[in-house]
């Protein structure tokens, strides 16, 4: 009887086993063919950030969520490979993808608990999960993981599997892969890790947060000890090595990639350009972009601009705290403040700080980055003293939780504030358009708006040289005499009213030459010139410099620079004068490399005298250069003569009510444009002239940029003659008699041809605003618009 029962039980058990094996076999047969392809492993391309470099190899920008440096398995030190294997998969080189003994041990524990509480995932299984599966704990997911692990083992070598694991695994602190983790936790190359450091990092894959040695040092130390004991058990190290590693004091020096702060505006320009081309892939494909800017030029440009903005703001009253954080509910105020300050940047030696307390005497206690506390008395508060607990200032008052800026002056801390005035500086290689320096404002972190390329501003008198160049092309000369006298134009003002423009200084010089008029920036002469040649002709001609129709008003006010454009566009346009009349396109990207170091693209710039189109007659460019040398020598930009160079030319510009101030100066090699103004346009007052606030910025930068470079000046082209100290085109020594110049002191009447040009100009402007790239067939040929010519280069670049 008993025998029969045993036989029956055994039969049932055997039957269930066969049935179970059958089910598993069927599941395998059904699931295995549906497993994903291993292409992503065989052709592994981890997400790697976009890195942007200056021309001299400094990192100026990095974009991407995952910080990773792909490393071949042979470049990881043996001590780290052994530590990871001892921690995660002791039988890695002996199993077929699944550790059967480990699975059995985990299965017993899971059956006892009644749920999936633990696993015995091998490194291969972790690779399968990290690349293809979710992290949910279900038997179905685990089954797929086992099959994938087997498939991976059949297709890849053990070392390749280990390489994938070492580069893909997340290890906390935004570190992906052990090479990145070595930098972030110990600030060293992965090849230089000690045994103790390797064992500490090897403990992170199990639980990056729980075993983070910075946040949880005690738990991390226990994990390190466990791994070292495993290494000893596997005969990877000796007892002496284990004990020495356990006693080694580890120094955690978090790696902070040094990104040059002076070129952030340039880096953002590159980021946008690559994003437009590649979308989100721009941040994951490991592109390395080399730009045309140099860090030393960037630093000089940044300091030159900041110096002027600081000086202007020096007499301003305190505008209030820049932010506020509520500390009333914080359990650990010091930690709360430290965390907040870690996200702020020190700008121009202005350190962010948070107010911790305001005393009865209205002194202030602040916390600096790093946790240091400093007491500020009324002397240290200075101009900000009136803001301390001043209810009239509302949310901007200095109180507990207020975020302010302080600066260390010879050991004493004092409250400071960032200037409200803004500006931009752009410096180009005149022959290629390569950007050598570009600063878009006082501080990129506080305001990312790039005034060099995004701020549409009136260029004021810096626009006049283009009108004068058009006049030379039309038939005038540098010695053409024009009456600098008041003018009144009925119907040319707002709503058809009388327009009565004035010279900026309110003084008039009578009959003067074009050279004298541009040198002194005479508005009346510019208007009379434009009336003579016609607005329509001027518009068409000036488009040769790269301006769009919408930037060229169809009115006489164009002579005074009332159109709106950007500092970069103005600098690019002036390069035509500097390089002998050729049209080049500005660009910041030089080369792009892929993750493997292969050259992906290289800029093919238009070069003056080679492949760049001739925009204007080289003789015209030369004569304009000689005229604008006088602007620097004896005119409105004579402050630029401080450089002591004879090859410099340029033009200042100031708009109505001193809202915008400009100076564009150049020699045959370099063009640099400086713009100064408030983001919300308002008068800068008496200090807001181009010659007083923009020229000093230009001088400070160009003193560095031109250091050690000889001033040769522009070579006189063929067909230019000199007579009585003036320069002329050989065939045009006198003004074209067909041009009507009304030099009376009353409103001059434009010629019939000028009237026709003006009417055409209005029509062209209206149509041009809706179609910037339309090529009008007028009196003068027009080159492709700036956007079109640049796009042609980008097409060749990408």
Curated annotation (Swiss-Prot):
It catalyses: [GlcNAc-(1->4)-Mur2Ac(oyl-L-Ala-gamma-D-Glu-L-Lys-D-Ala-D-Ala)](n)-di-trans,octa-cis-undecaprenyl diphosphate + beta-D-GlcNAc-(1->4)-Mur2Ac(oyl-L-Ala-gamma-D-Glu-L-Lys-D-Ala-D-Ala)-di-trans,octa-cis-undecaprenyl diphosphate = [GlcNAc-(1->4)-Mur2Ac(oyl-L-Ala-gamma-D-Glu-L-Lys-D-Ala-D-Ala)](n+1)-di-trans,octa-cis-undecaprenyl diphosphate + di-trans,octa-cis-undecaprenyl diphosphate + H(+); Preferential cleavage: (Ac)2-L-Lys-D-Ala-|-D-Ala. Also transpeptidation of peptidyl-alanyl moieties that are N-acyl substituents of D-alanine. The chain crosses the membrane at residues 10-30. PANTHER family: BINDING PROTEIN TRANSPEPTIDASE, PUTATIVE-RELATED, PENICILLIN-BINDING PROTEIN 1A. This is Penicillin-binding protein 1A. Residues 50-218 are annotated as: Transglycosylase. It comes from the Bacteria. Residues 739-798 are annotated as: Disordered. It comes from Neisseria gonorrhoeae. The active site is at 88 (proton donor), 461 (acyl-ester intermediate). Its EC number is 2.4.99.28, 3.4.16.4. Residues 766-777 have a biased composition (Basic and acidic residues).
């Amino acid at each position: 009887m008993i025998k029969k029962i045993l036989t029956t039980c055994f039969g049932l058990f055997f039957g269930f086993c066969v049935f179970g094996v059958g089910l598993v076999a069927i599941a395998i047969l059904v699931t295995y063919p549906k497993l994903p392809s291993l292409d992503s492993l065989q052709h592994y391309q981890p997400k790697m950030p976009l890195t942007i470099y200056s021309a001299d190899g400094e990192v100026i920008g990095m974009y991407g969520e995952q910080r990773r440096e792909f490393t071949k398995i042979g470049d990881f030190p043996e001590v780290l490979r052994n530590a990871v294997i001892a921690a995660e998969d002791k039988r890695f080189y002996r199993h077929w993808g699944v550790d059967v003994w480990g699975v059995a041990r985990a299965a017993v524990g899971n059956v006892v608990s009644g749920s999936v509480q633990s696993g015995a995932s091998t490194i291969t299984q972790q690779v399968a999960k990290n690349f293809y599966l979710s992290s949910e704990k279900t038997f179905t997911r685990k089954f797929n993981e086992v099959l994938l692990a087997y498939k991976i083992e059949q297709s890849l070598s053990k070392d390749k599997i280990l390489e994938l694991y070492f580069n893909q695994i997340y290890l906390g602190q935004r570190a992906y892969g052990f090479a990145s983790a070595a930098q972030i936790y110990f600030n060293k190359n992965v090849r230089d890790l000690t045994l103790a450091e390797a064992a500490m990092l090897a403990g992170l894959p199990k639980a990056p947060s729980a075993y983070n040695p910075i946040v949880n040092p005690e738990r991390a130390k226990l994990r390190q000890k466990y791994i070292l004991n495993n290494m000893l058990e596997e005969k990877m190290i000796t007892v002496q090595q284990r004990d020495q590693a356990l006693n080694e004091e580890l120094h955690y020096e978090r790696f902070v990639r040094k990104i040059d702060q002076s070129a952030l505006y340039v880096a953002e320009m590159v980021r946008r350009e690559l994003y437009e081309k590649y979308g989100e892939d721009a941040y994951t494909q490991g592109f390395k972009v080399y730009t045309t800017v140099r860090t030393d030029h960037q630093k000089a440009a940044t300091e030159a601009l900041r110096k002027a903005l600081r000086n202007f703001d020096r007499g301003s009253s305190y505008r209030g705290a820049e932010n506020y954080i509520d500390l009333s509910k914080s359990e650990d105020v010091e930690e709360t403040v430290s965390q907040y300050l870690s996200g702020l940047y020190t700008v121009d030696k202005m350190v962010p700080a948070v107010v911790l307390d305001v005393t009865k005497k209205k002194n202030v206690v602040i916390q600096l980055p790093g946790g240091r506390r400093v007491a500020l008395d009324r002397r240290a508060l200075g101009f900000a003293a009136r803001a301390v607990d001043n209810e009239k200032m509302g949310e901007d008052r200095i109180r507990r939780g207020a975020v302010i800026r302080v600066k260390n002056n010879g050991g004493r801390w004092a409250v400071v504030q960032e200037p409200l005035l803004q500006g931009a500086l752009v410096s180009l290689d005149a022959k290629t358009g390569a950007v050598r320096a570009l600063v878009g404002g006082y501080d990129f972190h506080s305001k990312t708006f790039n005034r060099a390329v995004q701020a549409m501003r009136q260029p004021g008198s810096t626009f006049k040289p283009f009108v004068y160049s058009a006049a030379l092309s039309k038939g005038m000369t540098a010695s053409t005499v024009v009456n600098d006298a008041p003018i009144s134009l009925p119907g040319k003002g707002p709503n058809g009213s009388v327009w009565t423009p004035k010279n900026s200084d309110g003084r008039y010089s009578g009959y003067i030459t074009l050279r004298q008029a541009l040198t002194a920036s005479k508005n009346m002469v510019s208007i009379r010139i434009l009336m003579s040649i016609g607005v329509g002709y001027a518009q068409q001609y000036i488009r040769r410099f790269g301006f769009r129709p919408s930037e060229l008003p169809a009115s006489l006010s164009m002579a005074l620079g009332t159109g709106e454009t950007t500092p970069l566009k103005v600098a690019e346009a002036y390069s035509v004068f500097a390089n002998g009349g050729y049209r080049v396109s500005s660009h910041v990207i030089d080369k792009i490399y892929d993750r493997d170091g292969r050259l992906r693209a290289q800029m093919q710039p238009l070069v003056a005298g080679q492949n760049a189109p001739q925009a204007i007659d080289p003789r015209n460019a030369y004569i304009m250069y000689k005229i604008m040398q006088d602007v620097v020598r004896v005119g409105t930009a004579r402050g630029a003569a401080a450089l002591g160079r004879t090859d410099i030319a340029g033009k200042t510009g100031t708009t109505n009510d001193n809202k915008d101030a400009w100076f564009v100066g150049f020699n045959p090699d370099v063009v640099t444009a400086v713009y100064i103004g408030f983001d919300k346009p308002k008068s800068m007052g008496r200090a807001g002239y181009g010659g007083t606030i923009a020229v000093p910025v230009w001088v400070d930068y160009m003193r560095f940029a031109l250091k050690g470079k000889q001033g040769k000046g522009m070579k006189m082209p063929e067909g230019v003659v000199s007579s009585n100290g003036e320069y002329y085109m050989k065939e045009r020594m006198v003004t074209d008699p067909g041009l009507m110049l009304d030099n009376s002191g009353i409103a001059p009447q434009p010629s019939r041809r000028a009237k026709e040009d003006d009417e055409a100009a209005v029509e062209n402007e209206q149509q041009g605003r809706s179609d910037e790239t339309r090529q009008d067939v007028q009196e003068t040929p027009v080159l492709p618009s700036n956007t079109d010519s640049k796009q042609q280069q980008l097409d060749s670049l990408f």
